[in-house]
Every structure is written in C-alpha cells, then in structure tokens.
Amino acid sequence: MLRVLGIESSCDETAAAVVEGAEHGHPHGVVVRSNVVWSQLEVHALYGGVVPELASRAHIRHIQPVIEQALAEAGVRPQQLDAIAVTVAPGLVGALLVGVAAAQGLAVALDKPLVPVHHMEGHLMSPFLMAGVVPAMEFPFVALLVSGGHTLLLHARDFGDYQLLGQTRDDAVGEAFDKGARMLGLGYPGGPEVAALAQSGDRQAVAFPRVLLDRSQFDFSFSGLKTALRTHLLKFPPESGGPSLADVAASYQEAIVDTLVIKSLSACRHVGVSRLVIAGGVGANRRLREKLAKQALKQGVQLYAPPIHLCTDNGAMIASAGVCRLARGDQARGVVNAVPRLPIHELEKIYGR
C-alpha cells in the first residue's frame, strides 16, 4: 500500500490530502484518508477575479496549516508517508511555486520521493475517487474538463495515455461565465451567480448562438457568445421592456450548456467509447450535470459526474495521480520547477520524456 500526500496550489485553492493506493499503481482502490481545501474566494471576490499576487500570498499563509490539518485528519505522521505529490503545471506561476517549494522541502526533510503532477491529470482521477459507483469507472473514457482556465475534451485511453480531441479557441467556459456575470451586474465567481439567477428564468427567452456545432471537430469558442450577450443587453435592456435578467441569464447558461453537451457526446461517438467524465470547477454546474446526464442516458453513455468537492481543485486528485505516477517510477530526479503552461498531451515532459 502506497501512502501519498498531495499538494495543490495552482490557482486560488490551497489544498492537501492523504490517500492510500495499491502498489500496482491503478487508480482503482485509492482511498481518501483526508482532503483539506482552503478557498481564497473571499480574497478575490472584491476584484471580480483571481489576482495572482494575492493568490500567491494567501498560499504562503495557508499552505503549512493545510498540510498539517491533512496529516492530522488522516492520522498519519509525516514519516509514514511514502511520497509527496504536488501540482507543477499548469497554473499561476507564483501560486504553483508555493506548493512546489513546500513539497520539495518536505521531500528533502523526510527523504521521500517527490512526484510532480499535471493538474489536469489530477482532474482525470476524480471519478476513480467516487465510492460505490456502479458500474465502476474504467478506461477508456472521454473527459470534459471545464474550469476557469481550461475547456477541453480528452480521450483517456489509459492512465498516462491521453489524446486531445478539442479545446477552447478563446475563453475558457469559466471565463465566459465570469464575464457574462459581470455584464449582468452579478458578482464573482460568475458561474454560481449566473446559475442562481437562471433558476427563475426562461431558457428559451433569448436565442443566443451555439458556436462551432456545425463542424466535425471538437474545439470550443465562447467569444461570440459573450459578444451576443453584450449586444442583446444594449439593444434590449431589461429596464426598458426587454427580457428579464433572469431570462437572459438562463438563456446564456443554456447556450453554454448545450455547446458542452453536444460536443461531449459527439466526441464519445467519434472515438467509440461509452463512458464520459466531467470534471473541473464548472462541472459543479447543476444544469450542465442535469442535461448531460439526460442526454447521455438517451445515447447509451455512462456519465461519471464526481461530487462537487471532487470537481473543484483538491489535493486528493493530485495525491491519487501521485500514487499512479510513483508506481511507474515517475518521480523527480532533481530540482522541480513550476511550469505555468503545459498542455496535458505534453505532460510527459514533466518526467523528462
């Protein structure tokens, strides 16, 4: 049994977790012993988005207490760890460096292996951490990874074997929600704000575009949708008799959801798999999960939608990927650097390959 501490600090959550997994290194059977997350939401809400410098400072203040709490909740002494895993890419460079420095210090002090982990590979581990799911998660599958900084579709053929099917050409879906929320006069983060307002709105009130649906590839684009929202609000302001803000929010959210659902299920058909995973912060959107589940069922696709605490950034997913990487011998051979930009299909560069 491998016992791994995972550390995550790529953006605005300071997280650490302890997991245990089998030495064969398959994500099945990984048990989460603790999973501690300190959110910086209140730090950044005043600014309407993540401020990198403030994020780094908050990580510095909270990284050690979060690690100590994760160890305490797991009932594990540092010497009982087999390795320390840490997110090294991609993310805000200052934020990444805080986690990397903490992990390297621990690894040296304890004389334990340090395992670098790609953030998006961590998200791919989240469905394997769902207890009691029938049928159990297996490779291969298609993954829709959606967050403030990423929107992409992957064909995960096996652990470490990922084919990029499509990605956003401009804004990530989380950015589309944040910027849309700002236009609607809502707060940050935009996704939950838009979703809350949309609950009382008519999803068909405004005919917003679904972009790139008529093409065979799986890229996304949300810049045109944002422009359509801005144009609509200028032409038909709610205070002058236009559709209500709730109707506009519901229609805007539905356009985003439709695009993600149609592309994801089309990708499943394209590669011939019947398992679909959704992960990342936007994966917590209730309407997206609801519509994806309904359409997946119609098309004979099994949807794996992890609980919200596993969709958003957390240490358990990093520790789980760390177990698998450690079993493959993928550990640091020297000083580890933070890499702010690294596509998941190039993640082997982390391990010198």
Curated annotation (Swiss-Prot):
EC primary class: transferase
Keyword field contains Metal-binding: yes
Cofactor(s) in the UniProt record: Fe(2+)
EC number of this enzyme: 2.3.1.234
Catalytic activity: L-threonylcarbamoyladenylate + adenosine(37) in tRNA = N(6)-L-threonylcarbamoyladenosine(37) in tRNA + AMP + H(+)
Stored SUPFAM superfamilies: Actin-like ATPase domain
Cofactor annotation comment: Binds 1 Fe(2+) ion per subunit.
Keyword Protein biosynthesis: no
Location in the cell: Cytoplasm
GO molecular-function term, one example from the UniProt record: N(6)-L-threonylcarbamoyladenine synthase activity
Keywords for the protein's UniProt record, in alphabetical order: Acyltransferase, Cytoplasm, Iron, Metal-binding, Transferase, tRNA processing
Major site of localization recorded for this protein: cytoplasm
Top-level taxonomic group: Bacteria
Any one Pfam family match given in the protein's UniProt record, by short name: TsaD
Matches recorded under PANTHER family: TRNA N6-ADENOSINE THREONYLCARBAMOYLTRANSFERASE, TRNA N6-ADENOSINE THREONYLCARBAMOYLTRANSFERASE, MITOCHONDRIAL
Biological role stated in the UniProt entry: Required for the formation of a threonylcarbamoyl group on adenosine at position 37 (t(6)A37) in tRNAs that read codons beginning with adenine. Is involved in the transfer of the threonylcarbamoyl moiety of threonylcarbamoyl-AMP (TC-AMP) to the N6 group of A37, together with TsaE and TsaB. TsaD likely plays a direct catalytic role in this reaction.
Protein family (similarity comment): Belongs to the KAE1 / TsaD family.
Name of the molecule in the record: tRNA N6-adenosine threonylcarbamoyltransferase
Origin species: Magnetococcus marinus (strain ATCC BAA-1437 / JCM 17883 / MC-1)
Gene that specifies this protein: tsaD
